[in-house]
């Protein structure tokens, strides 16, 4: 289970992990309500998070441990194309500023907890509600599993191998999430985000000085790409359209996920959400700096088993033991916060849009909270089992599909905020075409999220999620136009 352990790094790592564990259990008494036996309190923190709590929570939830590992890994592998995450996390915030306060008000006014609640309230359709809820759950499961991939990379760099350390970390996470609900990741997010800022700023300031400066970093990366015949410091060929459509599609999908919507619904006002849409791009700046670590991996001449090892190996090689332990703790804690919120978001969906809708319509508030707590445990265990017993590539493929799938819920969730013209049968038909068609196109392309199309005789590579969304909307419009008019049902 252990090899090549740096005692100082491990001690620092354990200290911060224990610190956030204590904070997780203390969180049940932070901003304590009369009772946590209500899904509004356990699953949404009482809908009372202000600007700063929301900023740390959404930032900690959106910019995950896997982001810290995967973005530099992608840049290390393909170069400039890996920077698509920057425009994606810029374009998303005007969308958040305009749409999310409207969605928050709808949820607040009618007591909705999930996207499925909003859809059922707008259209009165259990079928459409179930489609949206099921999509949210299955898109979230691999996302949680990938947080474990990020944590595994860190544990490996610490010299801890095997499943036991990972299982212990997730058991601890499960226990304090069960106890405190959304308050636990909200409180821990303060520590996680501050630690990540310190690590990334220190890395981009100190590491280049040890590698001959940024000129040498870029020159080394360019030489590495030229030597292997793939990747580049600049976009080329037909990458521009692929880059732009991937960024746009990812931006539209980002706040359709249950975990990001949970952060929105937990806010105390639409004004808080708008302030966060203005402030959250600070994390995008951090992400841009983080991506540069991929180029630094080439300058450091790292020998890697996997591109996902570039950040942990870089820190282990170039930082002192105590700071590498601090950095590894920041990344590991960066897995705990989003994993907790994701499991809560998935649990809320199951409880409200399956259990209450089909199993026990008269379930009490306390019963709802109990079902959500148990479901959150099951979700975490499921994600852990995926990583332990299935190839990591399985989780990666599912996550790739998850982004395309969750994007297909946008018409049902967002269009009804602005117009009553659309109706459930059309939206459900559109969802089915987008979901099925997007899945087929990804499979047909060899499990790649990009598809080659021809316009005016010119070939373009386009993000499959946007193609599926276009088909989704087109089908919804056509079917809706053929249906007799019917007033919306909002309850």
From Swiss-Prot:
One GO term in the molecular function aspect is: transmembrane transporter activity
Please state, per the UniProt record, what induces or represses the expression of this protein.
Transcriptionally regulated by the two-component regulatory system MctS/MctR.
Q: How does it sit in the membrane?
A: Multi-pass membrane protein
Q: Please provide the Gene Ontology terms (biological process) for this protein.
A: amino acid transport
- What disulfide bonds does the UniProt entry report for this chain? none
Q: Which PROSITE patterns match?
A: NA_SOLUT_SYMP_3
The alphabetical list of record keywords is: Amino-acid transport, Cell membrane, Membrane, Plasmid, Transmembrane, Transmembrane helix, Transport
The question of whether Transmembrane helix is a record keyword is answered with yes
* Protein name as it appears in the record: Monocarboxylate transport permease protein
Organism this protein belongs to? Rhizobium johnstonii (strain DSM 114642 / LMG 32736 / 3841) (Rhizobium leguminosarum bv. viciae)
Q: Which gene encodes it?
A: mctP
